[in-house]
Amino acid sequence: DDTVLEKSGVRMEGISRVFDHMKGRCVLGYKLLLCAFFDGKTTIPFDFSLHQEKGKQGDCGLTKQQRRKAYHAKRNNGSPDYERFQECKKPKMEVAVDMLRRGWKMGLHAKYVITDIWFTCEQLMACVRSIGKGAMHFVGLAKLGKTKYTVSGRKKNAAELIAAYERERGKVCRKYRCRYIRLNGNLGDTPVRIFLIKYGRN
């Protein structure tokens, strides 16, 4: 998962304006990417990274004067602090993949990788299934977007799957007060089990 670390000092190294979904606007700070192990009772963070966002203009949302005054340091290539700073500029998805692979090598052999909507994509699913020869499974929320899933030999997005299978396979879950459709299919080359869930009347 990732979260916003809001800061007030523009001179901090790697600082940028990042989008805060809770506030609906950009704030000064970092994006914290956290990978944690959960056994049903205890959550143990085992890896993290800080990230900046370049923005549409590639200026991190800062003025020239602010960027010039920001802290800069020369580092030896390959040193831990050099690698950590380079990591700050990498895409979060790329770093998330590295975290999962490091965790497996450390002996954290989870059965499932759970993420939010932003990380649910074919790239991360394929990575998770490749670790430990398929020992881990991926669980994540997905948007009702344009992503195509192959079900019964045909490619359809979520809305099209609902229209095609709601009457035939729609079921009610009284415990969670929802209606759902369960389908087996593929996202690219990765086999997936799809749950299309509707809570309440809307």
Question: Which role does the model predict for each range below?
Answer:
Residues 1-8, 35, 113-120, 138:
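Short, conserved catalytic/metal-binding motifs centered on acidic residues
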Residues 87-111:
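Short, basic/hydrophobic alpha-helical segments
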Residues 41-75, 85, 89, 135-202:
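An anionic, glycine-rich sequence signature occurring as long contiguous blocks
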Residues 8-11, 121-128, 147-154:
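A short acidic (Asp/Glu
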Residues 105, 125-137:
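Short, surface-exposed basic-aromatic patches at helix termini and helix-loop junctions that form
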Residues 2-64:
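Structured nucleic-acid-interacting core domains from mobile-element enzymes and related host factors
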Residues 110-115, 120-130:
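Aromatic- and glycine-enriched pocket-lining scaffold segments that form the walls
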